[in-house]
């Protein structure tokens, strides 16, 4: 069977959506299917990613002012004929897509009567601000024009056009796949559409550390939406606890860490397994209602329990392998939870539960969920 992945980003980024799609593509190829990828890139080229044939093509974007909404409109306008021409050369049995090129991909696939599966992993198709600090199911009133900053209001018609095209693409897809039950519920609330749930594929070998010298509390991506102000309060109140911070830190943010001698800032980290080797607890005080929360599963694969916000899809990623905080802006709740995990008995139970929960998110299990969803909706046997 021939399967095409039509994507704006397959392997030139390190986000969860890209890594999950790479893992799925490889799992499908290992089953003997012919897998090709057609992705946006800076130049026209063809190369092999293991058993997968990757083809790239550039798309025009403004060189002066980068604007995601305008670029998305421009990209899809040019991607449609490029994809149409690419499909002329090979007959595909299934097309898989996600994110910014989904509506042009669905349009071409529908016109050619090829089944198309769309992964719903991001908030961009529902909210121009991607619910930076609002809970999508309970706090969004769907009146975009009232909460946009004034600079975005000036291009509101382009924002509405993109949202409309995303909706049209979702409605025309043969199969919709959400990366969590939470995202499935968001899709139903906003567009009254149903989706199958396929959890992200986590390739354990990327994150499992054979040696552990764990004594640190880890915070990943020091950004406001990830809970930076909450973390700073926690670190200031727990001077006796050593913390690690992994992720790029700008000059303005770095100033906020002054005086916190118990915090070690690692900067951007390529191999997270080295960080997990030093981690005893993962801290996730996210203000943003994350669609899933891949980092919690990565940590759990090493038997590391998490203390995390009870928002978005995070509870699904944490499971019973940690402690969830509802009142996220009360730093005392986080401190109390960290103190609880200082108890060896409590920690051992959470660590064991975390490792057991992580087994639900292997690449093989994600593939099985995908196969069942495709067979149910399309009737194809992968």
Language-model-derived ranges and their functions:
Residues 73-74, 345-375:
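A charged, aromatic-enriched C-terminal amphipathic alpha-helix characteristic of glycosyltransferases
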Residues 137-175:
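Membrane-proximal helix-turn-helix segments that form the acceptor-binding/catalytic region
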Residues 174, 277-291, 304:
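Acidic donor-binding loop of glycosyltransferase active sites
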Residues 249, 261-278, 287-289, 328:
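Conserved active-site histidine-acidic residue motif and adjacent donor-binding/catalytic loop
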Residues 94, 109-148, 177, 196:
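Active-site proximal beta-strand in glycosyltransferases
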């Amino acid at each position: 069977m021939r399967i095409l992945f039509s994507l704006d980003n397959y392997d030139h980024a390190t986000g969860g959506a890209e890594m999950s799609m790479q893992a799925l593509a490889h799992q499908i190829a290992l089953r003997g299917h012919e897998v090709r990828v057609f992705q946006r890139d800076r130049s026209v080229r063809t190369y092999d990613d293991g058993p997968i044939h990757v083809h790239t093509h550039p798309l025009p974007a403004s060189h002066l002012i980068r604007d995601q909404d305008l670029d998305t409109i421009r990209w899809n306008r040019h991607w449609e004929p490029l994809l149409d021409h690419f499909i002329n050369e090979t007959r595909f049995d299934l097309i898989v897509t996600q994110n910014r090129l989904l509506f042009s991909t669905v349009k071409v696939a529908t016109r050619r009567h090829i089944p198309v599966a769309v992964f719903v992993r991001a908030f961009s198709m529902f909210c121009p601000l991607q619910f930076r600090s609002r809970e999508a199911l309970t706090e969004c009133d769907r009146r975009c024009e009232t909460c946009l900053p004034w600079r975005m209001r000036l291009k509101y018609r382009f924002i509405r056009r993109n949202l409309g095209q995303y909706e049209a693409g979702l409605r025309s897809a043969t199969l919709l796949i959400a990366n969590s039950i939470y995202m499935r519920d968001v899709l139903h609330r906003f567009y009254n559409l149903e989706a199958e749930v396929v959890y992200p594929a986590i390739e354990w070998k990327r994150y499992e550390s054979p040696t552990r010298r764990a004594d640190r509390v880890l915070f990943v991506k020091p950004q406001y939406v990830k809970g930076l102000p909450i973390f700073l309060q926690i670190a200031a109140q727990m001077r006796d606890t050593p913390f690690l911070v992994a992720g790029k830190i700008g000059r303005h943010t770095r100033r906020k860490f002054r005086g916190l001698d118990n915090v070690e800032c690692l900067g951007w980290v390529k191999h997270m397994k080295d960080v997990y080797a030093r981690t005893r607890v993962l801290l996730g005080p996210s203000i943003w209602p994350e669609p899933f929360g891949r980092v919690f599963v990565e940590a759990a694969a090493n038997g590391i329990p998490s203390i995390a916000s009870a928002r978005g899809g995070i509870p699904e990623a944490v499971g019973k392998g940690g402690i969830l905080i509802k009142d996220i802006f009360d730093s005392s709740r986080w401190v109390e939870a960290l103190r609880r995990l200082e108890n060896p008995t409590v920690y051992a139970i959470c660590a064991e539960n975390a490792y057991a929960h992580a087994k639900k998110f292997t690449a093989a299990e994600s593939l099985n969920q995908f196969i069942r969803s495709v067979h149910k909706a399309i009737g194809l046997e992968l």
